[in-house]
Amino acid sequence: MDTSYYRDFFSSVSIRDHKTGISKVSLIEAVEQEKDSDPNFYSDTLLSLTAWKTEEGAELTNPYLGRKAKVLAVTLWGNMRDTIPMALLSGNYVYQEDTYGCVLDSETAYELFGTITAVNNELLYKNNPYIVRGVVKSSVPVFLVQSSKSSETFSNLELKITDKGKGKEEMYAAAFLAGSSLTDDYSLIDGYFYGNLLYSSFLLLLWLILLCLLIFGFRQYIIYRKRTKKELLPCIGLTFIILSLILFFYYKTGNPLSFARKFIPTKWSDFTYLIKVINTLKEQLEQLQYLAPNPRELLLLKSLLTLKYRLALLFLLYFQLFLTGYHYRKQPHCVS
């Protein structure tokens, strides 16, 4: 899986309602209320809102071939990309106003139609006909459709925050919920933080290697700066190449410490801020383990579980680099 996938997919604040769900009507009213009461917040901070719910063991039918398949049905109001982990193989995702289209995973498409290129085929879900608009690759058999009922209720919300709210996405999401009174019993998961943390963990090793090479280049320059130009030029050239690599890598991958924005306090005099953030993250991780399982949270938990092993390996490799550099310094040619 592409490392940038984690950063791109976990790019919202997830709300998991613990009660009977949040109605579609109340969501529409909350959005309109937000536009009227605080238009600047809505236009400058809240980028999008997606509501969704899942149904295990939903049955799909090919009415012409009589084939049936059991899937995880996802009913939503908003952007399909913000629901469960998947990659589009053919066709398109269904936009919010299209209540007659659907999206299938490739295995279910083959099971129902005998081919994974099933776009424009018809199927039945709860005796209602739907046209396949897109086929995706997913870890589970899945069927996605936009909600057509005004009385629909959802247990999951995904709030996307604009760049103006970077580092404070969780705070803005909580403020939106408090102002709209959609629910007062929920779990909140800061996907921005976890997505950037997972993304950075894959790149951190390369960043550390480049940093060590840069330190090595500067040290060689200091050693040879009082010697002949013939000895000095290779050190300058090496340092220039390493700096160019760092700048190029930064341009292609972005800030490797973007997840750390969460730990920057709004007021520098707030010395308890860091403790509050750490406690909040601990609570979120504990809540994650007890939430009703869905592919989104399962991927996050699995990724966070492998993260600690990846960080342990990173520490060992970094320690090895340190020992190598230490022994190198002891060599006679390193003495200025």
What are these regions (language model features)?
Residues 73, 100-101, 122:
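A residue-level structural signature of the nucleotidyltransferase/glycosyltransferase Rossmann-like core
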Residues 45-96:
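The feature marks short, hydrophobic/small-residue-biased sequence motifs that occur predominantly
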Residues 208-254, 321-336:
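Juxtamembrane interface at the cytosolic side of transmembrane helices
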Residues 313-321:
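Hydrophobic alpha-helical transmembrane segments of polytopic membrane proteins
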Residues 20-26, 67, 98-100, 139-145, ...:
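Solvent-exposed, non-transmembrane alpha-helical starts
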Residues 1-59, 264-288:
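Membrane-proximal extracellular/periplasmic loop immediately following the first transmembrane helix
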Residues 162-164, 169-213, 253-310:
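A cross-kingdom feature of multi-pass membrane systems that activates on extracytoplasmic/periplasmic
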Residues 78-89, 104-163, 173-180, 189-190:
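Mid-to-C-terminal secondary-structure elements
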